Amino acid sequence: DQYKSIGTNEFLYDSLRYYGEPSEKDVQNAQFILHLPPNPNDKVGERVDAQGIIKILAAMVEQENYTWEMKLDETMVANALVSGTTVRINSNAKLYETDAHALAHHELGVHLATSLNGRMQPLQILSLGCPVSTTTQEGMAILSEFLSGNLTLQRLKTLALRVIAVKSLIEDKNFRTTFLILKETYNVSDDLAYTITARVYRGGGYTKDYLYLRGFSAILSAYEHEKDFNNLLAGKTSLEFLPLITRLIDKGLLIAPHFITPAFKNPVQSDAVNTFITHAIR
């Protein structure tokens, strides 16, 4: 429904209705991350272009036996986007190798995997998803980056900057003002400030981006405390429904997830500094 109102004042209203807005706690978490010094242990590797990104994604697809259709798209703001089993990649994307591997674990390891698992379910909603599942889905995607060893402090800062940008949008700041807040207050490059601002202002005001950091915190806690955590991969669902999903799987009414996120199966030892930081987000 929201896409019907793109470019109108209704789009921001629908965005707030679906995704809400950052709480004071969300903003405090973002500020905490943004005031941290660089982590000298973060390794980023060489820069790769869209073809290099495709090579990294294709390797994971082959390894995990995913079904996908890959399309290059020069009109995208994001670096990649999964819709069903179609993976769109920004033809202008240039990422460090670590970020490209993080992208693979994010988009394929969670978004594509839950799409494929959801299509196997008798309940169609688990394939389609809905706005209420966004926090969980994006939280799991960031967790996948973290457990694969590819979540850098700079990536966390980018997620934190999205919170600040959404807050600025809601405070009725215009595009230019939000861009300058990111650039001048947080010393962000022109390219990154523009990309973050464009993501938030697209369509007329898209508040979804603040949910990545909130979702990651909630999902990290669930990963560490919920024994049936992987059942969240059964489709496009939300953390609050995990007990119900588990009961339905146990009764044979839903199918246990076939595709398990690689980083959930084989997590790597994370950098001690970033591990401390991620657990400090509350």
Residue ranges and their predicted role:
Residues 1-95:
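Contiguous, non-catalytic segments that form substrate-binding/exosite surfaces or channel walls
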Residues 51, 102, 135-138, 172, ...:
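Conserved structured core elements
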Residues 81-86, 111-117, 189-193:
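Active-site-adjacent bridging/hinge elements
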Residues 98, 113-137:
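Post-HEXXH active-site segment of zinc metalloproteases
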Residues 99-113:
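Short alpha-helix carrying the canonical HExxH Zn2+-binding catalytic motif
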Residues 109, 113, 117-118, 145-149, ...:
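Hydrophobic/aromatic-lined pockets within catalytic cores
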Residues 127-167, 215:
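Post-HExxH zinc-binding segment in Zn-dependent metallohydrolases
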Residues 155-282:
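Conserved alpha-helical "signature site"
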